[in-house]
């Protein structure tokens, strides 16, 4: 009986969590799950990362992906989720340029190489509840690759930070993925500031250790560097 209860609880927990296995570029999804997006360690369990200082906060990967997606500068991108994104919290996107002599198919994204290209802020719904864009949908919010991003190979990283339990230490849950992309038709911008993952976040950052049930929408402070919009 206890085993059955445990299995049922595990199944419920899995349905409450999610992964982002498929990148969509200008409305066109990658051919199949984990084709250009690196398979994450939680591909089966769907559990998020809870220690923002651990190496898993970078890409949470168990392996690299076999392919690289072509993404024009200025393109709109988002991810398909395996389950409904039902937890409240921001969605943020980062890019990291692959160094010369390395490949998007093998590079690990280490060092101060990541820059943020977008984040989302909460708002009050008709019931005066704090919600985030694309909450309770099956896709992450759209973002645009800045037109001034230099051409080349990159890792594209998405994270959705679930904050429903974030009033306690390490209660925030990070659901994330990294995709291997080739940006074409880029510009001459200088993206920044550049940060390392791990390194950009602390467990007690105000956007990570936070009680979202006692705040107004404008009070929230997303973790990490400011957005580079090109």
From Swiss-Prot:
Q: Which Pfam families match?
A: AA9
Listed cofactors: Cu(2+)
One cellular component term (GO) for this entry is: extracellular region
Name the catalysed reactions.
Answer: [(1->4)-beta-D-glucosyl]n+m + reduced acceptor + O2 = 4-dehydro-beta-D-glucosyl-[(1->4)-beta-D-glucosyl]n-1 + [(1->4)-beta-D-glucosyl]m + acceptor + H2O
Species in which this protein is naturally found: Thermothielavioides terrestris (strain ATCC 38088 / NRRL 8126) (Thielavia terrestris)
- Write one Gene Ontology MF term: metal ion binding
Q: What is this protein called?
A: AA9 family lytic polysaccharide monooxygenase T
Technological use: Lignocellulose is the most abundant polymeric composite on Earth and is a recalcitrant but promising renewable substrate for industrial biotechnology applications. Together with cellobiose dehydrogenases (CDHs) an enzymatic system capable of oxidative cellulose cleavage is formed, which increases the efficiency of cellulases and put LPMOs at focus of biofuel research.
Q: Which InterPro entries match?
A: AA9, AA9_LPMO
Cofactor notes: Binds 1 copper ion per subunit.
Please report which protein family the annotation says this sequence is part of. Answer: Belongs to the polysaccharide monooxygenase AA9 family.
Record carries keyword Iron-sulfur: no
Q: Keywords for this entry? A: Carbohydrate metabolism, Cellulose degradation, Copper, Disulfide bond, Glycoprotein, Metal-binding, Monooxygenase, Oxidoreductase, Polysaccharide degradation, Secreted, Signal
Q: Which residues are glycosylated?
A: 142
| Keyword tRNA-binding found | no
